[in-house]
Amino acid sequence: MGSRSSTRIPVPLMLTVRVMLALSCVCPTSALDGRPLAAAGIVVTGDKAVNIYTSSQTGSIIIKLLPNMPKDKEACAKAPLEAYNRTLTTLLTPLGDSIRRIQESVTTSGGGKQGRLIGAIIGGVALGVATAAQITAASALIQANQNAANILLLKESIAATNEAVHEVTNGLSQLAVAVGKMQQFVNDQFNKTAQELDCIKITQQVGVELNLYLTELTTVFGPQITSPALTQLTIQALYNLAGGNMDYLLTKLGVGNNQLSSLISSGLITGNPILYDSQTQLLGIQVTLPSVGNLNNMRATYLETLSVSTTKGFASALVPKVVTQVGSVIEELDTSYCIETDLDLFFSRIVTFPMSPGIYSCLSGNTSACMYSKTEGALTTPYMTLKGSVIANCKMTTCRCADPPGIISQNYGEAVSLIDRQSCNMFSLDGITLRLSGEFDATYQKNISIQDSQVIVTGNLDISTELGNVNNSISNALDKLEESNSKLDKVNVKLTSTSALITYIVLTVISLVCGILSLVLACYLMYKQKAQQKTLLWLGNNTLDQMRATTKM
């Protein structure tokens, strides 16, 4: 296969803006129309928004791990809080030590700085091997060093507050939000209730909740046992640590509600621990999230193919899996550079490939330009549901209607059958019963036939078979050629020499000249003979007239 030319769009922020401005000049168009393609076995399964991103925004979240109890309930919760505090220190001290080692590696100036940095990273990695991702994480950790130091200056005030969420701004170079999942629990359970609780019940409630949170902490930091501080935390881990308070930071950083679910699903929001203070039980995490640009006039359209019936057997259409359309331009979209969610595609760069005129014409609705590859496998998908209806190849499988009862037949030469509630309310296919609620309106093309010229060979076995047929044809041609050669061998070569041919040509020319002269001479003699006949006839008539005149006298 030859290499394909591609359209590449990198994603520096300025270029992102330029791309969006350029595309905004294109008039919006509807998505790829799948109605004329469905009966040809090409099904448009859905569209997704196309976004480009670059990781550029950061913010800090300071997690208050140890809650402040109300004064009148401190004694009741003292025992579980002390046990919880000891467990926290044991669990997170390796993380804090790793962070300090990496951050202190930049204290040396000159050429020793890089060496100490790599040494600190290697020292925190099992087997002494640091990956590129770990080095990147360590570099980000060092860049956040000053911010972490400023947060530690405010640790006493952060630890003393009873607020579950509040902003920390003094001396910080980026947005920081202090949150406390356990503080939220204490506030909800004890500070905002007038109900009197006995000490045993308070101890039990606090102990159970702290144990649950410890379990979450262990789950979050379990992968960091071998390389503390160098493993990124996922958005799920951040939510486990901060609870619903995480939304406050994301909103402050500019993440809208319409994008939040897609960004969470994409995994583009990550966090790196930047500090841990065992005295106040504060855990600082730098959160990185992308700057996302939505290309409003560009969408990704997903295509699926069914095995259709042709006179050459079963075949599937040769079309891309994903295409994108901007204005009147349709190109294949490479999704290997993207992160996919239910509704969106997030690209670090956009790569498209131009399509051949035949495929372009096919996807534009000209089904006679579609090309198909033979697929005679028994497991090839012969049916697909679409908006409450079914597109099925009833030549490959038995299409049974339960309401009204009957077998749905497919006409000869018809590629697939479009089955909706107008033709069948309850549809049974391969043991699966479906109640149809959709309808194929008049805009859907039906009764499409695939011509023999549209079916080509692409599979290895089919190509081998075709090559065998070609070899047989070549063998037959060689036999005919050999027979012709044997006949030519019987020809007298002397008679076909150059001099003999020249002699034949000269004699032929002389014969033609003689023939022409003979013909001219014959014509002349005939003309002369006719003239003599006319003269004799005139003389005879004249003599007869004279004799008649003499007789009368």
Curated annotation (Swiss-Prot):
Transmembrane regions listed in the UniProt entry: 501-521
KW Flavoprotein (keyword) present: no
InterPro entries found in the cross-reference section: Fusion_F0_Paramyxovir (IPR000776)
Cysteine pairs bridged by disulfides in the record: C76-C199, C362-C370, C394-C399, C401-C424
Residues glycosylated per entry: N85, N191, N366, N447, N471
Signal peptide positions on this chain: 1-31
Coiled coil: 142-170, 466-491
Site (Cleavage): R116, L117
Listed GO biological process terms: fusion of virus membrane with host plasma membrane; symbiont entry into host cell
Family matches, as Pfam families: Fusion_gly (PF00523)
Positions of S-palmitoyl cysteine lipidation: C523
Subcellular location, principal: virion
GO CC terms: host cell plasma membrane; membrane; viral envelope; virion membrane
Region (Fusion peptide), start-end ranges: 117-141
Ranges facing Cytoplasmic side: 522-553
Role of this protein: Class I viral fusion protein. Under the current model, the protein has at least 3 conformational states: pre-fusion native state, pre-hairpin intermediate state, and post-fusion hairpin state. During viral and plasma cell membrane fusion, the heptad repeat (HR) regions assume a trimer-of-hairpins structure, positioning the fusion peptide in close proximity to the C-terminal region of the ectodomain. The formation of this structure appears to drive apposition and subsequent fusion of viral and plasma cell membranes.
Similarity remark: Belongs to the paramyxoviruses fusion glycoprotein family.
Protein's name in the database: Fusion glycoprotein F0
Source organism per UniProt: Newcastle disease virus (strain Queensland/66) (NDV)
